[in-house]
Amino acid sequence: MDATIYSDGTYLRNNPDWHADDAAWKAGHIARMLERHRMRPPTVVEVGCGSGEVLVQLSQQLAKGTRFTGYDVSPNAYTLCANKVDRHLDFRLGDYLQTQEHHDLALAIDVFEHVEDCFAFVRALRARAKYKIYHIPLDLSVLSLARPGKLMAMRKSAGHIHYFSRDTALALLEDTGHRVVDWFYTSGATELGNPGWKTRVMKLPRNALYRSAPDAAARWLGGYSILALAQ
C-alpha cells in the first residue's frame, strides 16, 4: 500500500476524526497499565499521534508535571492536533525516529501495523525510550479469516498492512529486542460505542466466551487488541 494515503487526504476521508472518538478509551487503558506498575513517567512521547486526542486525554489523567509530545509524519493528522498544544502538551510534524530525542515513555498506539518495515520501526523505537507501550490490533482470528474480504476491507479503510494474533504480536516485540513486562487484552468490539450491527450481534458471544476463555475469544471471534508494556 502506498504510504501517500496518509498525506494525500485518502486516510482522512476514510477516517474523518482520525479515531479521536476512541481516544478516551485508549488513554484509559494506558493509564491503567501505568497504574498497575506505579509508573509516573516525567516525559511521554506518542509516535504516530494522529489527532492528538490520546495525549490530550492522557494529560488529564496523569500527574500534572508530566510533559507530553506527539509526533506524526502526516500533514493531515498534524492539522487535527496542532491546535491542541498547551504548556504541558506539544505536537510536531515529523518523524520522531529521525530526531535525537529520548523520553521516559514512548507510545505507539495502533501504529506499526501501518508501517511497511514494522520490524525496523519497532527496533528503532526500543532505543528511544526507557519504556514503551504498544497497542496492537489482533486482526487475525478464525472469524476474520472465514469472512471473505474482511482483511482486505481493513487494509483499504484502516490502512493495516500487517495482521497479528496475540502470539505473533508479542513475538515481534521480543524479536526486536524488547522485554515484555506486562500485557492485557482490550476489546474495542465490546467496549466502544456506536458499533455496526454485525459487531452488536457478536457482543454477547464475545463477552460470554471472554469471561471463561479470553485467549479463545480473541483467537476465534476477534475484536480484540493487546496493550503491551515493554523495555
Tell where the protein language model's regions lie, with residue ranges:
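Conserved helix-to-beta-strand junction in the class I
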Residues: 124-128, 135
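Short, glycine-/aromatic-enriched active-site segment of Class I SAM-dependent methyltransferases
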Residues: 135-160
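Substrate-binding/catalytic lobe of Class I Rossmann-like enzymes that use SAM or dcSAM, i.e.
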Residues: 175-176
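Short beta-strand segments
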Residues: 133-135, 184
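Helix-to-beta-strand junctions that scaffold the AdoMet/dcAdoMet cofactor pocket
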Residues: 115-116, 129
